[in-house]
């Protein structure tokens, strides 16, 4: 019997040059500019992957909707989508936009249209002008001959008001005429595809076919974003891999319904993480079901954290904290990690403006001597709190060097001040750069 060191498998592993690498290069796509006033958000091209969100208010309630949009924008949402489903909602859109402008909130608004968008855009020009982008669902824009006419009316409105569109296909509202035709064609094949593959192909054909029709109607390729949303993780990955291969349009990623709590977060992360790692995706929306009474901003934070943990963007300083074990019977490190994370998020609206680059800072809060000092040295700022039976002292590391040891009841306050001082010292104020 060969020893492990002599086995062919072991020899092969040891002699093979390691191949390391991060995410794949971004898929090439048309850049789509979305504007409101002086605010420009570009989707696709070489722009960063964008985070967007959607309100759940009654859009006819202009004040309530504007308040929620402001909350989402303050959390970091770069575009906010609102439902435009009734004449009352369409009539409220200019008032919503006006209130946001008065509050200094310039985030572009996306109108979400289903069934009657062609009528609302025609009858409420103030709505058409106040929105920065239109979402069109080709599966419910109309049936039969009306579908082509009503789709054309929406594209003509987009061209008239110089607005980009997202042609968003959902498997829950897929064009049934297209699906029936494709099922019939599949039945005539010598080797028919399975039903799932036909569904995937129908989603892709609906999206690309509608986009090409929009181009024929005069809308530029740089005014079109596509999406093909489904609820299953593997389904989303399969559809977007093929969609990305077959077109050059900017792509919007997201599950149709991710679900609640940890399940929704895990599903979204699993699906989007794979696609983003492969360079597929230009903007994302995390469709979480919030807990009753919970803030809508959770979906924005999850989207940001997906991009930041993958190294694609930076939004706020990252707090690295150990999970705890039998060595960490004290809850001090957990409490400190939570306090520091909350403190950093609270400071970011000001720090983002005054201290550019601070969003890339890493802070480590560790619970014992095993990994604490080592992990702390790899962060910009780190603290290693004492575990069970350890000396009741907490060494602090800055840029890899031990600079101080904290003791006593005010460790949290003192460490927070160290973080604040580090930010002020290491990240230049914007006025100093101008």
Swiss-Prot record:
Q: So what does this thing catalyse?
A: (2E)-4-hydroxy-3-methylbut-2-enyl diphosphate + oxidized [flavodoxin] + H2O + 2 H(+) = 2-C-methyl-D-erythritol 2,4-cyclic diphosphate + reduced [flavodoxin]
Q: What class of enzyme is it?
A: oxidoreductase
Give a single Pfam family match.
GcpE
GO-annotated molecular function = 4 iron, 4 sulfur cluster binding; 4-hydroxy-3-methylbut-2-en-1-yl diphosphate synthase activity (ferredoxin); 4-hydroxy-3-methylbut-2-enyl-diphosphate synthase activity (flavodoxin); iron ion binding
Q: Which InterPro entries match?
A: Dihydropteroate_synth-like_sf, IspG_bac, IspG_bac-typ, NO2/SO3_Rdtase_4Fe4S_sf
Q: Where is this region: Disordered?
A: 1-24
Residues annotated to bind [4Fe-4S] cluster:
322, 325, 368, 375
Instruction: Establish whether keyword Iron-sulfur is in the entry.
Output: yes
One Gene Ontology term from the biological process aspect of the record: isopentenyl diphosphate biosynthetic process, methylerythritol 4-phosphate pathway
What's the cofactor?
A: [4Fe-4S] cluster
Per the record, where are the segments of Polar residues compositional bias?
1-15
Sorted alphabetically, which keywords does the UniProt record give?
4Fe-4S, Iron, Iron-sulfur, Isoprene biosynthesis, Metal-binding, Oxidoreductase
- EC number assigned by the record: 1.17.7.3
- Cofactor note from UniProt? Binds 1 [4Fe-4S] cluster.
Decide whether keyword DNA-binding is in the record: no
Protein function: Converts 2C-methyl-D-erythritol 2,4-cyclodiphosphate (ME-2,4cPP) into 1-hydroxy-2-methyl-2-(E)-butenyl 4-diphosphate.
Q: Family membership, please give it.
A: Belongs to the IspG family.
Q: What is this protein called?
A: 4-hydroxy-3-methylbut-2-en-1-yl diphosphate synthase (flavodoxin)
Its encoding gene is what? Answer: ispG
């Amino acid at each position: 019997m060969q020893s492990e060191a002599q086995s062919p498998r072991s020899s092969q592993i040891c002699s093979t040059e390691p191949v390391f690498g991060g995410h794949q290069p971004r898929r090439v796509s048309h850049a789509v500019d979305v504007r409101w006033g002086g605010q420009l958000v570009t989707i696709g091209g070489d722009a960063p992957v964008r985070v967007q969100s959607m309100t759940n208010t009654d859009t006819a309630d202009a004040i309530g909707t504007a308040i929620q949009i402001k909350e989402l924008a303050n959390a970091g949402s770069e575009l906010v989508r609102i439902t435009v489903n009734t004449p009352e909602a369409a009539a409220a859109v200019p008032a919503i936009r006006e209130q946001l402008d008065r509050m200094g909130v310039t985030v572009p608004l996306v109108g979400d249209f289903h069934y009657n968008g062609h009528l609302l855009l025609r009858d409420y020009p103030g709505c058409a002008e106040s929105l920065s982008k239109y979402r069109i669902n080709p599966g419910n824009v109309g049936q039969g001959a009306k579908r082509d006419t009503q789709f054309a009316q929406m594209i003509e409105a987009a061209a008239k008001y110089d607005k980009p569109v997202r042609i968003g296909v959902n498997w829950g509202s897929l064009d049934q005429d297209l699906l029936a035709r494709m099922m019939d064609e599949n039945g005539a094949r010598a080797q028919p595809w399975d039903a799932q593959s036909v569904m995937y192909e129908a989603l892709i054909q609906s999206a690309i076919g509608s986009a090409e029709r929009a181009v024929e109607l005069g809308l530029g390729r740089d005014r079109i974003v596509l999406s093909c949303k489904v609820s299953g993780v593997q389904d989303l990955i399969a559809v977007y891999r093929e969609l990305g291969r077959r077109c050059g349009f900017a792509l919007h990623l997201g599950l149709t319904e991710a679900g609640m709590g940890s399940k929704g977060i895990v599903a979204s992360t699993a699906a989007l993480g794979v696609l983003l790692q492969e360079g597929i995706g230009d903007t994302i929306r995390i469709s979480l079901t919030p807990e009753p009474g919970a803030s809508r901003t959770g979906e924005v934070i999850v989207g940001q954290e997906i991009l930041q943990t993958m190294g694609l963007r930076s939004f706020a300083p990252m707090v690295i904290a150990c999970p705890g074990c039998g060595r960490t019977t004290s809850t001090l490190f957990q409490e400190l990690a939570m306090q520091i994370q909350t403190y950093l998020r609270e400071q970011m609206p000001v720090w983002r403006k005054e201290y550019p680059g601070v969003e890339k800072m890493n802070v480590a809060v560790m619970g014992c001597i095993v990994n604490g000092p080592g992990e702390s040295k790899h962060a910009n700022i780190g603290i290693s709190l004492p575990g069970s039976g350890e000396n009741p002292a907490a060494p602090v590391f800055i840029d890899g060097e031990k600079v101080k040891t904290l003791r006593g009841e005010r460790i949290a306050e003192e460490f927070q001040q160290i973080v604040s001082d580090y930010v002020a010292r290491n990240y230049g104020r914007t006025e100093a750069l101008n």
